[in-house]
């Protein structure tokens, strides 16, 4: 009987307790809910001629004629309302290019939907990242649509890009996400096995 207890103790010692999230990422269902762009070549041409080509020739961010953000953390901070602006914004994203990490892209549609301001989310055509690299290493550009931005440019974006729609979130828009942890065990992998 004592021999069987020792073997049981050895089996237990080879496993350790861990906590795994029940939902790996609460935004995975919404990650594929990008609004449709009706005339993508036109939108891409407008963005290149009106914004990107001008930004390429400007040396520093302080000289930009518009308020815009290209860093992922700055964009998230802006969309969370930290800047206190209620002006509508356009967020252009290279979501079809492999250079942009999926972890960043999964959160974008829901962040835009939950933002306190009106956000027009615009997905750009494949290989747009080649042009975008000189402006943004993350393939994202958030442009505040205030008086400094051409009204015709903004109206074309508004007309050709659908609204974000998450009908199942309308009633619970400001309720926090509840992610639970599951208590389980995993085997302890020795360093000899890893090599």
Curated annotation (Swiss-Prot):
Subcellular location, record wording: Nucleus
Other information: Present with 1360 molecules/cell in log phase SD medium.
Family indicated by similarity: Belongs to the POP3 family.
Superkingdom of this protein's organism: Eukaryota
Its job: Required for processing of 5.8S rRNA (short form) at site A3 and for 5'- and 3'-processing of pre-tRNA.
Entry's Gene Ontology cellular component terms: cytosol; nucleolar ribonuclease P complex; nucleus; ribonuclease MRP complex
Keywords, ordered alphabetically: Nucleus, rRNA processing, tRNA processing
Any one GO biological process: rRNA processing
Subunit: Component of nuclear RNase P and RNase MRP complexes. RNase P consists of an RNA moiety and at least 9 protein subunits including POP1, POP3, POP4, POP5, POP6, POP7, POP8, RPP1 and RPR2. RNase MRP complex consists of an RNA moiety and at least 10 protein subunits including POP1, POP3, POP4, POP5, POP6, POP7, POP8, RMP1, RPP1 and SNM1, many of which are shared with the RNase P complex.
Protein name per UniProt: Ribonucleases P/MRP protein subunit POP3
Native species: Saccharomyces cerevisiae (strain ATCC 204508 / S288c)
């Amino acid at each position: 009987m004592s021999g069987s207890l020792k073997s049981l103790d050895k089996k237990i010692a080879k496993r350790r307790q861990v906590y795994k999230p029940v939902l790996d990422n609460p935004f995975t269902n919404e990650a594929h809910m990008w609004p449709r762009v009706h005339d993508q070549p036109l939108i891409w041409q407008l963005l290149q001629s009106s914004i990107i080509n001008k930004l390429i020739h400007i040396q520093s961010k302080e000289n930009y004629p518009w308020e815009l953000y290209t860093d992922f953390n700055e964009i998230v901070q802006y969309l969370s309302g930290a800047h206190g602006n209620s002006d509508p914004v356009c967020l252009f994203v290279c979501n079809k290019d492999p250079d942009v990490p999926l972890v960043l892209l999964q959160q974008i549609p829901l962040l835009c939907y939950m933002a306190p301001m009106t956000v027009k989310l615009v997905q750009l055509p494949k290989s747009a990242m080649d042009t975008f690299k000189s402006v943004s290493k993350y393939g994202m550009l958030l442009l505040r649509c205030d008086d400094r931005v051409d009204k015709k440019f903004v109206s074309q974006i508004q007309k050709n890009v659908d609204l974000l729609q998450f009908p199942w979130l309308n009633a619970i828009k400001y309720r926090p996400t509840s992610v639970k942890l599951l208590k389980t065990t995993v085997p302890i992998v020795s360093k000899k096995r890893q090599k």
